[in-house]
């Protein structure tokens, strides 16, 4: 299932839907985007802790898969279904100890302390709800394939317990996402490409755990992955320009560029690869790479070795396809257009550059504030 929060530009989402991906969403905004993109309601997985009653009603009407995150959501959904004679296909999110710390236990129902089984019992006591899946999401940028194997094994144990007690088959296991891209984490001594597992490694760990869990062959659950970063990060590039070169008080070279953390949110945790876009000096120097924003935290790279750049030189930032176009912000500068390059090399503008008119569209000024003298 394509993770909408990773990059929800319509053109990007439709690329993955054309390849057969369902939609995985965590808000009604993303949910409606998926519907408008042509995804059938039954192929939308509705995750997240913030589902209102109105959100749940829409998901029920469209026969979507509702992943219940907490008891309040469970009770709210159960009451609505019972009062209105509706049916819903549901799953629960399960958090668990996989040996990775800190543990992501703020979402879902805990495996070890019995919360997950208690939630399952409550669901199975409501004939209006059909428990069809089990879901987990154990972390982000996960480098341990063994953690996925442990998570898969624990979900399998729950699925077998459901079968034994209620004679009900869990139709799918959703292992969530968190698969790493080749970006390098800040503070890492090794490049990301040297330490991340391959998708084959992730697949081997997960599928081996499921195949070895003891399911009858004809009752193996469907495996769902909520892939985002690992699929789109590599495909995204940010193009920018050098606007100034200066020396800091300690003598370090500083290069100021026309893109900042407002556009490159992931620079807070990645040391993005940056390269010149033209023939450049053979000499190089360590430098700080600053964005143009009027705040001291606008740092793209705290230390990077690059050729000696000049004002007007162009740069390319690599692997920016994940989370930057959903977490970017309009601050000081307006956001640029986004271009998709087709398989035949044809460029397509898939999001236009913002303008002052764009930003004012949702503003309203009271009449008494429209006249003043300075």
Predicted regions and their residues:
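Active-site-proximal beta-alpha core segment in soluble small-molecule metabolic enzymes
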Residues: 1-172
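Conserved active-site and cofactor/substrate-binding residues in soluble primary-metabolism enzymes
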Residues: 7, 72, 111-114, 118, ...
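Short acidic, glycine/proline-rich loop/turn micro-motifs
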Residues: 101-105, 184-189
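Glycine-rich beta-strand-to-loop/alpha-helix junction loops that act as flexible
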Residues: 138-139, 173-182, 225-229
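Short, electropositive alpha-helical surface patch
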Residues: 144-158, 188-200, 233-243, 372-374
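Alpha-helix-loop-beta-strand connector modules within alpha/beta enzyme cores
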Residues: 155-157, 161, 199-214
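Charged (often Lys/Glu-rich) extended helix/loop segments that serve as interaction or gating elements
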Residues: 205-207, 211-374
């Amino acid at each position: 299932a394509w993770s909408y929060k990773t990059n929800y530009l319509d053109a990007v989402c439709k690329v993955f839907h054309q390849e057969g991906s369902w939609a995985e969403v965590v808000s009604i905004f993303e949910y409606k985007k998926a519907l408008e993109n042509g995804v059938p309601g039954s192929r939308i997985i509705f995750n997240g802790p913030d589902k209102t009653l109105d959100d749940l009603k829409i998901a029920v009407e469209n026969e979507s898969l509702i992943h219940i995150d907490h008891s309040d959501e469970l009770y709210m959904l159960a009451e609505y279904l019972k009062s209105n004679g509706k049916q819903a296909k549901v799953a629960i999110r399960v958090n668990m100890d996989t040996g990775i710390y800190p543990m992501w236990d703020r979402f879902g129902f805990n495996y070890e302390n019995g919360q997950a089984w208690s939630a399952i019992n409550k669901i199975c006591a409501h004939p209006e709800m059909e428990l069809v899946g089990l879901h987990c999401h154990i972390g982000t940028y996960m480098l341990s394939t063994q953690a996925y194997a442990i998570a898969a094994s624990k979900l399998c144990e729950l699925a077998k317990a459901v079968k034994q007690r209620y004679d009900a088959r869990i139709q799918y296991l959703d292992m969530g996402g968190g698969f790493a891209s080749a970006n390098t984490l800040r503070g890492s001594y090794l490049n990301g490409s040297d330490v991340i597992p391959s998708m084959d490694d992730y697949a081997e760990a997960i599928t081996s755990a499921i195949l070895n869990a003891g399911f009858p062959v004809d009752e193996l659950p469907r495996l769902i992955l909520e892939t985002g970063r690992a699929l789109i990060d590599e495909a995204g590039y940010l193009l920018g320009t050098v606007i100034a070169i200066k020396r800091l008080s300690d003598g370090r070279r500083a290069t100021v560029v026309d893109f900042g953390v407002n556009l490159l949110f992931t620079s807070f945790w990645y040391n993005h690869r940056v390269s010149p876009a033209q023939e450049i000096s053979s000499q190089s120097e360590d430098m700080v790479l600053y964005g143009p924003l009027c705040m001291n935290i606008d740092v793209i790279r705290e230390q990077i070795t690059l050729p000696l750049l000049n004002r007007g030189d162009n740069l390319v930032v690599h692997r920016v396809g994940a989370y930057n176009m959903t977490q970017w912000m309009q601050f000081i500068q307006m956001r640029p257009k986004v271009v998709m390059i087709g398989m035949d090399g044809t460029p397509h503008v898939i999001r236009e550059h913002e303008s002052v008119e764009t930003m004012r569209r949702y503003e309203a000024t009271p009449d008494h504030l429209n006249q003043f003298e300075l």
